[in-house]
């Protein structure tokens, strides 16, 4: 944004330099410069000093441009020169927007003439030299014209923001509405405005616990842990500190005796119809037969069922399958299959036929016989270990019927 009267920034024309000591120490020019808005600027422009007239004209042009931009319907801009009390509409924005107290008197960034001796004592580094004073006077013309390389000293008692906003009392909002900065945390006001209560070492008055997900209170106001508080709320008394002993195992109750067989050892104690204790065996017997268990069935030891699967049956089944596999081995590459016998059993090997030897039976295990339906037996070729694919060994045409079960020579391939 171009400001009229500030074209000297882009050209070789230097900024107005206040080198006259009378301008530095004089308060009349300063009072006329910041007293009553544009009227005071017009009065200052008619001053006899040419440098003061140039500075007043520049500030007046900047003020008018800022007023026109501030009232734009698109961009709402708060007055940048709100530190000047005489400018209309220049009340400190930050103080009335966030503070509930009265408005603080606006103050400028630059110290007044009366503060100069105290700053000289507080500034041992010599920052109150001519260069620093010229920078501060340039800031009076426009805050945007500050030299980027020059920063304000930390020892300078600045009581307002760079744009003249009042000292803001609350640490949670900055005068411009920005989030908290690191300077706000280091401010003494920030530490004083948040009084933090010291950590209390709570302890349950009943069990002495110091850690619990929820602290409760009894009727007298003492702290209770969550467990003790719930117990007191449900039962109306304090929770016992010592856990009750677990119930003794039923089978090991001392002095318990079965009323039927007089045994003292059992896996489970039961009760009969009259409520007397009985052992597990007598109780189950009475439950199934509705009669007391006979004393002749009593045994000294406790008989338990073997719930593990026995391997005897598996061994017998494996041996039977091995014998059947040895009998199913073909001899000479052929197998005779009975198609339809008088007994109605289809798929049985013809009786009286010896199939292979025991040494070659393992080669054909897992290959069952081919079952065909028909009134008589059929002769089917069976693939041997050296004949290749089984599909190439079987005939594709119709199988001729025979009147008797016999073994013939192998078919020529």
Curated annotation (Swiss-Prot):
Annotated stretches, region: Required for interaction with ZFPM1: 203-222
Assigned GO CC terms: nucleoplasm; nucleus; protein-DNA complex; transcription regulator complex; transcription repressor complex
Keywords, alphabetical: Acetylation, Activator, DNA-binding, Isopeptide bond, Metal-binding, Nucleus, Phosphoprotein, Repeat, Repressor, Transcription, Transcription regulation, Ubl conjugation, Zinc, Zinc-finger
Region Interaction with CALCOCO1: start-end pairs: 249-315
Modification(s) after translation: Highly phosphorylated on serine residues. Phosphorylation on Ser-310 is enhanced on erythroid differentiation. Phosphorylation on Ser-142 promotes sumoylation on Lys-137. Sumoylation on Lys-137 is enhanced by phosphorylation on Ser-142 and by interaction with PIAS4. Sumoylation with SUMO1 has no effect on transcriptional activity.
Cross-linked sites for Glycyl lysine isopeptide (Lys-Gly) (interchain with G-Cter in SUMO): 137
Biased composition (Basic residues): 305-318
Subcellular location as annotated: Nucleus
Gene Ontology MF: a single term: zinc ion binding
Residues modified as N6-acetyllysine: 233, 245-246, 252, 308, 312, 314-315
Zinc finger (GATA-type): 204-228, 258-282
Tissue-level expression: Erythrocytes, and fetal hepatocytes.
Bias kind Polar residues: ranges: 117-128
SMART domains reported for this sequence: ZnF_GATA (SM00401)
InterPro entries: Transcription_factor_GATA, Znf_GATA, Znf_NHR/GATA
PANTHER family attached to this UniProt entry: ERYTHROID TRANSCRIPTION FACTOR, TRANSCRIPTION FACTOR GATA FAMILY MEMBER
Self-association and partners: Interacts (via the N-terminal zinc finger) with ZFPM1. Interacts with GFI1B. Interacts with PIAS4; the interaction enhances sumoylation and represses the transactivational activity in a sumoylation-independent manner. Interacts with LMCD1. Interacts with BRD3. Interacts with CREBBP; the interaction stimulates acetylation and transcriptional activity in vivo. Interacts with MED1, CCAR1 and CALCOCO1. Interacts with EP300. Interacts with CEBPE.
Swiss-Prot/TrEMBL domain comment: The two fingers are functionally distinct and cooperate to achieve specific, stable DNA binding. The first finger is necessary only for full specificity and stability of binding, whereas the second one is required for binding.
Protein's job: Transcriptional activator or repressor which probably serves as a general switch factor for erythroid development. It binds to DNA sites with the consensus sequence 5'-[AT]GATA[AG]-3' within regulatory regions of globin genes and of other genes expressed in erythroid cells. Activates the transcription of genes involved in erythroid differentiation of K562 erythroleukemia cells, including HBB, HBG1/2, ALAS2 and HMBS.
Protein name: Erythroid transcription factor
Naturally occurring in which organism (per UniProt): Rattus norvegicus
Gene: Gata1
């Amino acid at each position: 944004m171009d400001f009229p009267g500030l074209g000297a920034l882009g050209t070789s024309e230097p900024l107005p330099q206040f080198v006259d000591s009378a301008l530095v120490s004089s308060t009349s020019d300063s009072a006329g410069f910041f007293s009553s808005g544009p009227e005071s600027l017009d009065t200052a422009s008619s001053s006899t000093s040419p440098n003061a007239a140039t500075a007043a004209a520049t500030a007046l042009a900047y003020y008018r441009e800022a007023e026109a931009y501030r009232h734009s319907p698109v961009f709402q801009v708060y007055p940048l020169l709100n530190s000047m009390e005489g400018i209309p509409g220049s009340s400190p924005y930050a103080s009335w927007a966030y503070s509930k107290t009265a408005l603080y008197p606006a103050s400028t960034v630059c110290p007044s003439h009366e503060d100069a001796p105290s700053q000289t004592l507080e500034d041992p580094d010599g920052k109150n030299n001519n260069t620093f004073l010229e920078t501060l006077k340039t800031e009076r013309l426009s805050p945007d014209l500050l030299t980027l390389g020059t920063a304000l000293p930390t020892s300078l008692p600045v009581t307002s923001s760079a744009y003249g906003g009042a000292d803001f009392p609350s640490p949670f909002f900055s005068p411009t509405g920005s989030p908290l900065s690191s300077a706000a945390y280091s401010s003494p006001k920030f530490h004083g405005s948040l009084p933090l209560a010291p950590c209390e070492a709570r302890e349950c008055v009943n069990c002495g616990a110091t850690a619990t997900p929820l602290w409760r209170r009894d009727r007298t106001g003492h702290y209770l842990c969550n467990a003790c508080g719930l117990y007191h709320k449900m039962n109306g008394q304090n929770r016992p500190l010592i856990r009750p002993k677990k119930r003794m195992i039923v089978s090991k109750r001392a002095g318990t005796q079965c009323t039927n067989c007089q045994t003292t050892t059992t896996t489970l104690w039961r009760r009969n119809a009259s409520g007397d204790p009985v052992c597990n065996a007598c109780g189950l017997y009475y439950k199934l037969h509705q009669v007391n268990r006979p004393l002749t069935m009593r045994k000294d030891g406790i008989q338990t069922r073997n719930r593990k699967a026995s391997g005897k049956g598996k061994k017998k089944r494996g041996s039977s399958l091995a014998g059947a596999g040895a009998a199913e081995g073909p001899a000479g590459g052929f197998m005779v299959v009975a198609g339809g016998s008088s007994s109605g059993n289809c798929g049985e090997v013809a009786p009286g036929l010896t199939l292979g030897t025991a040494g070659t039976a393992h080669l054909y295990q897992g290959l069952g016989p081919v079952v065909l339906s028909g009134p008589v037996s059929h002769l089917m070729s069976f693939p041997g270990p050296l004949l290749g694919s089984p599909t190439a060994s079987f005939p594709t045409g119709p199988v001729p019927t025979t009147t008797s079960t016999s073994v013939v020579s192998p078919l020529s391939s």
